[in-house]
Amino acid sequence: MEIAQALILGIVQGLTEWLPISSSGHLVLLQIILLSRSSAAFIALVHAGTLLAVIVAFRRDVFNVIKSFLEGISELPKGSAFSSPERKLPLYILIGTVPVAVLGLALAKYVDEIFGSSKIVGVGLLITAALLYSTKWAGGERPLDLRRALIVGLAQSIAIFPGISRSGATISTALLSGLKREEAIRYSFLLSIPALTGFLILELIVSPAHEILNPEGLVGLLSSFITGLIAIKFLLSIIRRGRLHLFSYYCVIVGIAILSLL
């Protein structure tokens, strides 16, 4: 892989991981167009960039979640460990992560078939479009609870399939469940951290060290980190203005084009 290709793939990963248009789908398409299949190490590094981006963007929330979890653990002997909403959030994140972990392990041996199909990408983008468009009528003032945490976690699990946007699926589902807009944003982004971390660890385990420590990988990591931060800031402004559904038009156009041409 050349530096220019690494830069392009890193930028695409950074933008599409957080914009609700499916990063996995666009990476699959780019690899088909560039006739170059990225190594597991490179994919891990660009995901590391987007993971760092969300941690930096939500650093206060990440700190508070860790703090609440540790405080909850320390309060276990007193019986009031996870009684407050802030103390419950770490548990909701763990519970919401279970579906994607289970489905990911179940589909591990089918990775090549799933990520080698442009048709799956096309169908996935149409599903994403439907979810995004439905947010025109979504919204509410309900708090996060166990049921909604699990429902959003299930939505995250289907984003394993290329073409289905993780952020699009989780934020749309959170809004459709009646969550407050800021609550939906916060939970969706915090929920992504364990999933991305798990994926990153699995990819690094099977990656030779020489494939990780190279200029192309560094370019991919830095470009995905920088563009990831930009994408998060842009997406937050779109959601807060109630315009998440606008991304559905792009997903429909690209999804139909893929199914028609590839």
Curated annotation (Swiss-Prot):
Entry-linked InterPro entries: UppP
A Pfam family recorded for this sequence: BacA
Signal peptide, first to last residue: none
GO cellular component labels: plasma membrane
Membrane topology, record value: Multi-pass membrane protein
Keyword tags: Cell membrane, Hydrolase, Membrane, Transmembrane, Transmembrane helix
Transmembrane segments: 15-35, 38-58, 91-111, 114-134, 149-169, 189-209, 219-239, 242-262
Catalysed conversion reaction: di-trans,octa-cis-undecaprenyl diphosphate + H2O = di-trans,octa-cis-undecaprenyl phosphate + phosphate + H(+)
Family in the record: Belongs to the UppP family.
Purpose: Catalyzes the dephosphorylation of undecaprenyl diphosphate (UPP).
Protein name: Undecaprenyl-diphosphatase
Organism name: Korarchaeum cryptofilum (strain OPF8)
Gene name linked to the record: uppP
